[in-house]
Amino acid sequence: MSLTSWFLVSSGGTRHRLPREMIFVGRDDCELMLQSRSVDKQHAVINYDASMDEHLVKDLGSLNGTFVNDVRIPEQTYITLKLEDKLRFGYDTNLFTVVRGEMRVPEEALKHEKFTIQLQLSQKSSESELPKSASAKGTDSKVEAAAEVQPRATEALKSEEKPMDVSAMPRGTPLYGQPSWWGDAEEDEQRAFKANGKPEGKSQEAGASGCSTEAKHVEGQSAAASEEALFPFCREPSYFEIPTKEFQQPSQIAESTIHEIPTKDTPSSHTAGAGHASFTIEFDDSTPGKVTIRDHVTKFTSDQRHKSKKASPGTQDLPGIQTGMMAPENKVADWLAQNNPPQMVWERTEEDSKSIKSDVPVYLKRLKGNKHDDGTQSDSENAGAHRRCSKRATLEEHLRRHHSEQKKKAQSTEKHQEQAATSSTHHRGGHGVPHGKLLKQKSEEPSVSLPFLQTALLRSSGSLGHRPSQEMDVMLKNQATSASSEKDNDDDQSDKGTYTIELENPNSEEVEARKMIDKVFGVDDNQDYNRPIINEKHKGLIKDWALNSAAVVMEERKPLSTPGFHNSEEAISSSGSKRWVSQWASLAANHTRHDPEERLMELSATVENETDTGDAGVSLRSTSCTTSLASQGERKRRTLPQLPNEEKLLESSRAKVVPQRSEIGEKQDTELQEKEAQVYQSEKHDADRGLSKMSRAVNGESPKTGGDGKALLHSGSSSSKEKSETEKETSLVKQTLAKMQQQEQKEQAQWTPTKFPSKNALGHIDKCREESSKQESQLLEKVSGHSTSKGDRVIQNESKRRKAEEIPKCQASKGDKKESSKSLVRQGSFTIDKPSSNIPIELIPHINKQNSSVPTALALTSASRLRERSDSLDTDSSMDTTLILKDTEAVMAFLEAKLREDNNKTDEGPDTPSYNRDNSISPESDVDTASTISLVTGETERKSTQKRKSFTSLYKDRCSTSSPSKDVTKSGSREKIEKKAKSRSADIGARADGRKFVQSSGRIRQPSIDLTDDDQTSSVPHSAISDIMSSDQETYSCKSHGRTPLTSADEHNIHSKLEGGKATKSKTSPVASGSTSKSTTLPRPRPTRTSLLRRARLGEASDSELADADKASVASEVSTTSSTSKPPTGRRTISRIDLLAQPRRTRLGSLSARSDSEATISRSSASARTAEAVIRSGARLVPSDKLSPRTRANSISRLSDSKVKSMSSTHGSPSVNSRWRRFPTDYASTSEDEFGSNRNSPKHTRLRTSPALKTTRMQSTGSAMPASSSFKHRIKEQEDYIRDWTAHREEIARISQDLALIAREINDVAGEIDSVTSSGTAPSTTVSTAATTPGSAIDTREEVGDLHGEMHKLVDRVFDESLNFRKIPPLVHSKTPEGNNGRSVDSRPQPAEHPDHLTITRRRTWSRDEVMGDNLLLSSVFQFSRKIRQSIDKTAGKIRILFKDKDRNWDDIENKLRAESEVPIVKTSSMEISSILQELKRVEKQLQVINAMIDPDGTLEALNNMGFPNAILPSPPKQKSSPVNNHSSPSQTPALCPPETRALHPAAAGVAAAASTEFENAESEADFSIHFNRFNPDGEEEDVTVHE
């Protein structure tokens, strides 16, 4: 029979017959199902006006509206559909065209549709629609089916018309996360399901009675059969066509029977039709639209079902059409048979209505893996329905099946997990039923009672979470219902594999499909990915889960302070969301990723389990309510993938690297803690430094099991250690199981509050957490007391020592708790957990490269390390500690204020830093974490230093260091610093951005960045670090290159530093620089003291590249040179100094090659500079003058002794000393080991600082590296340069600096630094030092300013640095903050005074390292000096060429200069030294000649002396030339040189002549550098002014 019917023809060509009744259009249980998420579940209604025989569409107030002819129709208003009207629902890709046409409806189909023949023939579609509505609701569902059959018959017509349409048919927008392949075979079904599933849903809803159930049976079964039948009948297979087929014969029966069939399994036709279709559709009255399809077909084999389906279709279908229809129908039937469509259907329906995740949950149910947590729908959602319906049983079956699978996968893990899970899970199992209900409630009724939600959420979160997975395992075992509700979690958490819940007849195909879907949605994580990952993680994570019980409590507590995290965790808590999100987020995030709280719980559980037992119960219970609420939210949030791919990746990395609780606790902890801890960052960093160590120890569980060192090492080598940790944690799990049980209850109490992310609650909980954290830390001390208590107490004592301990002690408690709760977050490096904004850097396992050598965190963690550091600090401890205590008090006050501020900010936007950090850390987690680890390690160590410096000092340093270095960057840096100081957490992102920006612009700003590097080292490691990153990365070749790999690491460092807190910042900057470089090589065996010393002496390359001392010497030099020149090298050709130093490079392997390895060293140098700058600024700020000399002496002694012996003592001492002043407390205070671990890079830097001083000269050249580009320019633009005084002066300045570098290096090598430094080397050293430290900044500027800026920068840097090195006095520092590079004249004189000590110290240090340093340095210095001489000869020749047209008596000048400058070679035991001295003297002469050539009458010098300050300010390079020279000379040359001379003379009184010569060179260099500034077209001169 043919019916004239209205059709909606989708853009895909699918015809949907519009039944003559009202049909719903939407995503859920609608007659017309659209998959687009822009379509509401009930989006619109298409009604039929029988009188007018027209259809009207009414938008049901949908979010995205309904569009007729692209005009949005008013809501709740019927709009008549006319022919060819284009109908669009929401933004669904299907554009439906209203078509009226004949639809041939087979009698069977009409009968099947419950169309009586009269309806079929007389009423046709209208009657069918009427009967549909008129029919009993069973009939209604059938009629809906019929009505849909008509639209779908229309579709079927289309299908008939285009049997290919079903497959070709637009399947609707795939569900989010749905692969395009979904429904290829299923699409027909999906269509059928779309037609029959959703309409069924409606029908079911409408005929909530068995009719709908039957309809669903019929629909599900008939979907294929009916499709075939309908295809003949022009019905799309997407209609209830399997039933049609079945019912075409049975349909006739079904007409009558179908009304009966709506009973569970009216066998009329679908029983016969599709054995698999035999299922009971149970409507959950409590959940309208939720139909539980009990698959009786599970009893049927897929083949049986398939055969039944096909049999009924074959039997019923028209042979001709049936054959045509059979392909799609068979497709559908096959799919249905294979995929247990009944299960799919009920799953679909339940999930559809229930599924928050899926646009078209029904489709998801259809989807093969839809039963499992698809990205779109989670089993939890299904579980919600099934919990109400049979879904629970099915889920239990699936859970059993999946868990059996997972068990197999995770059994080893499960064993541990089950231990924890049985305890915790049984514990939670007690809550299992409520949890299942709660899961439903959470999914459906977020406002479910908090107690249940708490339990359920704890469970749900736990189930979803890692621990809950265990719980789920047990719960599922214990409670099938609970398992159903938690099945999603279990499926999600199936990783445990502990679930014995198995489907009666788990359909392997269905499982396969589910797995595919799960895989698509990341749910597969549950089964395969998550489980295996989790299994690895679970080894530790299971313990973590056991701990998670405790950790959940902690986590809940933490999420309290981290509302966002709660949401995340909530989303994670949502079983499906967590699950599939977890895979999407990352396999690693499986356990750690989604439930930040959970992660926190897990990690926290590890650490906190002990503490949480006592503490968590208190705080967590208070947080319990919020947690529950949050969990509900999470439940809902599960709808969407909670973890971004980045986070997933991060988490995945984290899970992989810190597969267990580090990432779990860390990430969750990190996010939470970051919010909390950012407030506490400095304090907490202090506390967290210890706590981090403790946390790591706890996380590594080594503290629990062994020592902090082990724990940290475990965290550091998380995979290997965590395995042991897993076992350790197994016992811990056992230990914590009781705690977990307690804590689980606590968690239940606490979970809700934790998830209740109100800021008040956060603050309140923070307090509670602090208290509980304190308790926890105490508990940790008690429980983990083996090492943890030692580490904690040591940490706490250390914190007390630091005075930061006071707040950090609270925060150490907090930090303990937090860090306990947050085992280190393997952000960036191991776990690519998205560095939560809440994650304080402490939480991030900042495994220094030196963590390998002396895991800073470990060092800090270990009481011995802490005490070593204290001892080393004690060396400077009396001063450092006093200063630190004072500073710490100031910092504490500041931090307290800031904590309050940050608590607000953290609550508000702690994510920003986290994400900024994520920006740096997440993507580059390995590098970043390496950086972060080094940073944190450095931070931890630096924290003490920085804590010693008051945060204010640090802040000042930050500001001051930034400001001198860059005007722009200075402003940006300073602003950033201030912002960071103000809102460290909030600004961490900005800092990272600023850092990135600085990196972008920092190359011009880099000098300031370099200073910022100092600043970074200082209190402003955020900005400083970003600056360091940019300046190190960009400015310091070594830094740049060393850091460039670490850029992310640097960013991470920055983030870490930013978050790491102030104290950590001081340390971290240097360590971050060096450590970052080492971080880059993070997975490095822990350096031995020997390695550290060797590296310190020879540079990091010594371990790998530098086998011989010469190489080592070269390495240290080159590292600095390389770092200095490297960025130019990277950007430009090797700078002059690099060229000069090239032999060394060659020795090193290649200076450029060295750059990378030196990048570490140079970065270390940069870091050292940073640290030095910081220490300079910080020490100065912190009356580091007294401290600095002592610190310098101590640190230099230590450094010299341990690491920078030769370099440090020689030229290294002054530069190192200044640097040490920068890191005075850090370096002086920390012991050699700490020095190695903390300042391993810094030491290297210091070493490199001496070689780096040489290299610094090289850096001058390195900064001259831009100069080398400039050199090329000079070569290229020789004429231009000839015309350009700037170029000449640059050349001259470069040469002078080369000479200075060579002289300084020679002096250093010769050990005559004292004498030479006094006269010649002092400027040289100054130049070298300046080049090394400020020079980094100068390098940046130089790069910018090319030769002009270069020389100026180099000279400025040299002078400033020498001044800085010498004048670390706070007074100088205060000025230095304004101009770190261009230290004011005042700052120079002061350093000049201090350099006496420095020089002396350097001399003493040198005596220790003299032999090695001599040997190593001499050859390299010799080569370097030769290169410098050659370079200067070339330069002199070039200058001659440049000035050949000037009327100058070059020969006279040269002769005069030679005669004057002929200083008798200092008699030394080393021919190399003599040669070096000769070379340097030649260079000196050449430089003097050049100086004479350039400024034969001394006009420039006079101008420089007179107008140098002004000269800096003038932007015209040439005008600058004169003024700059004036400025430079008086400022730098006169003021600087004499002080330096004075400073150096006491130490270097021996070689006054050489020193004089070098001083002259330095003076000329100063002039040149000033000229350089003048010539600096980039306005670096202004920077110089600022600096100066």
From Swiss-Prot:
Q: Where are the compositionally biased (Basic and acidic residues) regions?
A: 155-164, 347-357, 407-418, 645-654, 663-691, 720-731, 764-774, 789-821, 899-908, 967-980, 1049-1062
Q: Which SMART domains match?
A: FHA
Gene3D superfamilies given for it?
Answer: 2.60.200.20
For this chain, the Swiss-Prot or TrEMBL PTM comment says: Phosphorylated; probably by PLK1.
Pfam families, from UniProt?
CEP170_C (PF15308), FHA (PF00498)
Name the predominant localization.
Answer: cytoplasm
Recorded superkingdom: Eukaryota
Tell me the segments the record calls region Targeting to centrosomes: 1103-1588
GO cellular component terms attached to this protein's record:
centriolar subdistal appendage; centriole; centrosome; ciliary basal body; cytosol; microtubule; spindle
Q: Using the UniProt annotation, give all residue ranges assigned to the region (Disordered).
A: 121-172, 299-323, 338-447, 461-508, 602-854, 899-1222, 1228-1247, 1315-1334, 1370-1398, 1511-1540
Coiled-coil region(s): 1467-1495
- Modification type Phosphothreonine: residues: T498, T639, T752, T906, T912, T1012, T1047
Which keywords belong to this entry? Coiled coil, Cytoplasm, Cytoskeleton, Microtubule, Phosphoprotein
Using the record's annotations, give every residue carrying the modification Phosphoserine. Answer: 141, 355, 358, 443, 463, 494, 568, 577, 628, 631, 662, 718, 829, 870, 872, 922, 925, 950, 1008, 1048, 1102, 1104, 1122-1123, 1135, 1150, 1155, 1188, 1195, 1200, 1229, 1231, 1241, 1260, 1270, 1362, 1521-1522
Question: Low complexity composition bias: which ranges?
Answer: 1075-1093, 1112-1128, 1158-1173
Modification Phosphotyrosine occurs at: Y363
Matches recorded under PROSITE patterns: FHA_DOMAIN
Q: What does this protein do?
A: Plays a role in microtubule organization. Required for centriole subdistal appendage assembly.
User: Could you describe the subunit structure of this protein?
Assistant: Interacts with CCDC68 and CCDC120; leading to recruitment to centrosomes. Interacts with PLK1. Interacts with NIN. Interacts with FHDC1. Interacts with CCDC61. Interacts with TBK1; efficient complex formation may be dependent on the presence of CCDC61.
The text of the family note is: Belongs to the CEP170 family.
Record protein name field = Centrosomal protein of 170 kDa
Q: Give the taxonomic lineage as stored in the record.
A: Eukaryota, Metazoa, Chordata, Craniata, Vertebrata
